[in-house]
């Protein structure tokens, strides 16, 4: 698999596989997953050439980190990039909060019986990293991201104060760890292109993970954030490139777009993209993945999986050669931003 390299602000070098493994689904995302399958999924990633493994305390309240660590136990540490996030502290004695109706809240069916508590402070970041290392079973992380500090997660009233808390607290902590080379790189993991811009301008970050805002269906990240990331020399890890499902499944009944049933306008657009893909003998899933990989600011596309076979499919689709005429036909049909960089 293609490898992409970048150098962090502290001089540390990182090598990314074009396709990474996102471990959110291993935290019992939407459905329970047995331990053996979860660990085998991570092990298959290693065997298939995946070298980027991303997690978060949020995923199953720490369960995904634990499973990822078990799957990486025999990995050669200097040949993989391990990423996790801060912003939530897991309390084994706390009450789980009620789901708020004013924010998007994709559900976990299982996970550890711990209560998450938002904390973007200096001490909270340090504590979160310590807890993550214990769950994963490592003595260091390569990348640490400020997680979900956006309107998507906190609602409009709380997003601003949370941003200020993160920049005054967590960012200072992460910058200290980076300067001391305890971590190689620091960044943020956000669901909104505008908030990515806000963070990129506010701090001196190495990497960013943007979810769902650069895909075949949503190219809002192309307008300002991706050019800004290139200008600042940031590596971009893309997540959510299938927009939570529909670009992987195609226009099947009940297909999901951004964690909800896709509206008719999205279904129609997907059907039109599928037709162009059929003419070029590729799947919409392959096109969605290859489109994301093609942007020069992107160092890795992080893909979820719940079985070893899904990992194999991800790696295969990340390596399929796309005909240049596919992209030109999509642009001619106004199904793709004409300014979007493409390969082939």
Feature annotation, model-predicted:
Residues 1-101:
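N-terminal binding-site loop/beta-alpha segment at the start of enzyme catalytic domains
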Residues 4-5, 37, 149-344:
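Beta/alpha (TIM)-barrel catalytic core signal, keyed to glycine-rich beta->alpha loops juxtaposed to Asp/Glu
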Residues 15-19, 49-51, 76-80, 138-142, ...:
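Short, well-ordered coil/turn segments that N-cap beta-strands
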Residues 22, 32, 56, 144-147, ...:
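Conserved residues at the C-terminal ends of beta-strands
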Residues 24-36, 110-126:
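Active-site mouth loops of central-metabolism enzymes
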Residues 94-107, 251-255:
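Short, flexible, mixed-charge acidic loops at enzyme active sites
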Residues 119-140:
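An active-site-proximal structural segment forming one wall of the substrate-binding cleft
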Residues 133-156:
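Active-site groove signature of glycoside hydrolases
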């Amino acid at each position: 698999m293609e490898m992409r390299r970048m150098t962090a602000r502290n001089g540390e070098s990182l090598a990314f596989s074009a396709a990474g493994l996102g471990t959110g689904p291993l935290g019992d995302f939407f459905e329970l997953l047995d331990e053996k399958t979860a660990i085998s999924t991570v092990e298959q990633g290693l065997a298939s050439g995946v070298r980027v493994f991303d997690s978060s305390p949020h995923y199953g309240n720490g369960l995904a980190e634990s499973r990822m660590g078990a799957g990486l136990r025999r990995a050669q540490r200097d040949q993989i990039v391990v990423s996790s996030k801060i912003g939530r502290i897991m309390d084994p004695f706390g009450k789980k909060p009620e789901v708020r109706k004013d924010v998007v809240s994709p559900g976990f069916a299982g996970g550890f019986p711990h209560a998450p508590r938002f904390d973007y402070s200096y001490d909270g970041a340090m504590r979160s990293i310590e807890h993550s290392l214990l769950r994963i079973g490592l003595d260091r992380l390569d990348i640490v991201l400020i997680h979900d500090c956006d309107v998507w997660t906190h609602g409009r009233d709380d997003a601003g104060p949370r941003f200020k808390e993160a920049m005054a607290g967590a960012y200072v902590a992460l910058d200290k760890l980076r300067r001391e080379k305890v971590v190689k790189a620091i960044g943020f993991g956000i669901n909104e292109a505008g908030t990515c811009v806000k963070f990129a301008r506010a701090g001196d970050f190495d990497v960013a993970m943007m979810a769902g805002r650069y895909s075949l269906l949503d190219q809002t990240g192309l307008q300002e954030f991706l050019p800004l990331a290139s200008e600042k020399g940031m590596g971009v890890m893309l997540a959510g490139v299938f927009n939570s499902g529909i670009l992987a499944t195609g226009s099947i009944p009940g297909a999901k777009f951004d964690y909800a049933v896709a509206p008719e306008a999205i279904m129609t657009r997907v059907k039109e993209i599928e037709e162009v893909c059929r003419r070029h003998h590729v799947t919409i899933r392959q096109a969605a993945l290859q489109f994301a990989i093609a942007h020069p600011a992107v160092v890795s596309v992080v893909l979820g999986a719940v079985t070893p076979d899904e990992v194999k499919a991800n790696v295969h689709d990340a390596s399929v050669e796309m005909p240049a005429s596919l992209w030109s036909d999509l642009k001619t049909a106004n199904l793709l931003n004409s300014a979007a960089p493409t390969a082939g």
